């Protein structure tokens, strides 16, 4: 196996076979309020 991708393989790749997927955020960032509450809980 070489590190470089096989250009012939890339050229014959059919993009239409790819399915469109809806991106779902799995790890939404906590809100500022949540962060502040956790900070205060950790300090007490």
UniProtKB/Swiss-Prot annotation:
UniProt lists compositionally biased (Basic and acidic residues) regions at 1-25, 33-44
InterPro entries registered for this protein in UniProt: Beta-thymosin, Beta-thymosin_sf
Q: Which residues carry this modification: N-acetylserine?
A: 2
The cross-link described as Glycyl lysine isopeptide (Lys-Gly) (interchain with G-Cter in SUMO2) comes at 12
User: According to its UniProt record, where is this protein located?
Assistant: Cytoplasm, Cytoskeleton
**Residues found modified as N6-acetyllysine:** 4, 12, 26, 32, 39
One Gene Ontology BP term is: positive regulation of blood vessel endothelial cell migration
Q: What induces this protein's gene, according to its Swiss-Prot or TrEMBL record?
A: By alpha interferons. Decreased levels in THP-1 cells after treatment with recombinant interferon-lambda.
Under the GO molecular function aspect, what terms does this record hold? Answer: actin monomer binding; enzyme binding; protein sequestering activity; RNA binding
The UniProt keyword set, sorted, is: Acetylation, Actin-binding, Cytoplasm, Cytoskeleton, Isopeptide bond, Phosphoprotein, Ubl conjugation
Instruction: List residues modified as Phosphothreonine.
Output: 23, 34
Among its keywords, does the record have Cytoplasm? yes
Pfam families registered for this protein in UniProt: Thymosin (PF01290)
Primary localization class, coarse: cytoplasm
List GO terms (cellular component aspect). Answer: cytoplasm; cytoskeleton; cytosol; extracellular region; nucleus; platelet alpha granule lumen
Where, by tissue, is this protein expressed? Expressed in several hemopoietic cell lines and lymphoid malignant cells. Decreased levels in myeloma cells.
Which residues in this protein are found as Phosphoserine? 2, 31
Region annotated Disordered sits at: 1-44
PANTHER family of this UniProt entry? THYMOSIN BETA, THYMOSIN BETA-4
Q: How does it assemble?
A: Identified in a complex composed of ACTA1, COBL, GSN AND TMSB4X. Interacts with SERPINB1.
Q: State the similarity comment.
A: Belongs to the thymosin beta family.
Give the function comment from the record: Plays an important role in the organization of the cytoskeleton. Binds to and sequesters actin monomers (G actin) and therefore inhibits actin polymerization.
Q: What is this protein called?
A: Thymosin beta-4
Gene assigned in the entry: TMSB4X
């Amino acid at each position: 196996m070489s590190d470089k991708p096989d250009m012939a393989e890339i050229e014959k790749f059919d993009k239409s076979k790819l399915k469109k997927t809806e991106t779902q955020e799995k790890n939404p960032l906590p809100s500022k309020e949540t962060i502040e509450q956790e900070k205060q809980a950790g300090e007490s």
